Structure formats: C-alpha cells, structure tokens
Amino acid sequence: GCGSEGVGINRGGLPDRGRRDAVKGGMTPLLYAAREGADAALAELIRRGANLELPEANGMTPLLMALLNNQLGSARQLIEAGANVNTDDFYGRTPLWAAVEYRNLDMNNRIEDSPTSNNVDRAASLPLIKLLLEKGADVNARTREVPPSRKWLYALNDVSWVDFTGQTPFLRAAFAGDTTVMHLLLDHGAD
C-alpha cells in the first residue's frame, strides 16, 4: 500500500482504490458556461430551458462544475434556477463539499513562484455555502474516490491532504481548521 488504510482521514499516499483518471467528453454548452463563469451565456441557456442536471462523462453537473472551478456567480445562478444541490459525481464530490474545498484549498502558486493561495475569496464563498445549506445540501454526504485534482498534488509531492474516501464537508473544513464552516455545518446536522 501507499500508506492509506481504510475509510477516513488517514494522511499520505493514494488509497488502494479510486485511481481512475477523469473521462473526457460529454460537455454541454451549459457545462462550458458554468466552468468558464460566462454568466450572461449561462443565464441565456437557463432562460431557454437548458437541462440543469445533465452531467459530463464523470457525472459532474453544471453546479458542481461551477464550484470546482471557483465560479461562485455561476454557481449562485444555477442554485437560484433550481439546480440539485445534492448531486454528486463519480468521485462522490457534492456541491457543498466542493464549496468547502475551494474555500480552504491553499496551495503555492508554483508557476509564479509566489506564496499566494488559489485566488479564492474566502469571504465570498461563505454566503454560497450558506445558500447550499438553506437549499437542503446534505452535510453528511461522503466522497467515494480520489478526484483527479488531488492526483497532481500527489505528483508534486504535496501529500499534506486528507484521504478522500469517505470525506464529508465537515472533515474537509476540520482539516483546514475552518471553524466558521465547521460550526455552520454542525448547526445543520453534520455528524
């Protein structure tokens, strides 16, 4: 093994399962607009009846696509249009997990050799987390597999991350020391 055993929050290595690379394809105009934060195009597609739940090849819906690409405005538009806040992809990532993840994903900007974080506005992401909770997001949903975004961190020898199998939004917030979100999730029934 690579140092990871069982389900939970063990550090280090990739788990024995979940090594599938992302499958390419299945992108719709709505998914592209959500990924790029093209809010005007997104609004027009929604107005014309685009399917808010049609996923790409890995099961990622437009809402999850927006959140995983830090497009908070697009995510808010999709939620307000009625997107399912409890959908998940092949890896088990939900919109709530993604919002907590990107609120707390700090990494060095190796391209510019700068110690800056990932350009996430922590303050702006909190209202979106609250909105997801108001709309009934499952605070206890668990991830199932290691997402592709973590495989490259492993390749860069940055293994200071939590084993993703079985991780909840609360565990992700706890690992980052995000007590604000931890309290919020507990108030909404997190285990």
Annotate each predicted stretch with a short phrase.
Residues C2, V7-L14, R20-D21, Y32-A38, ...:
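Ankyrin repeat A-helix N-terminal signature
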Residues A43-N51, R76-N84, K130-D138, H183-D191:
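Ankyrin repeat domain, specifically the short helix-to-loop turn at the C-terminus of the second helix
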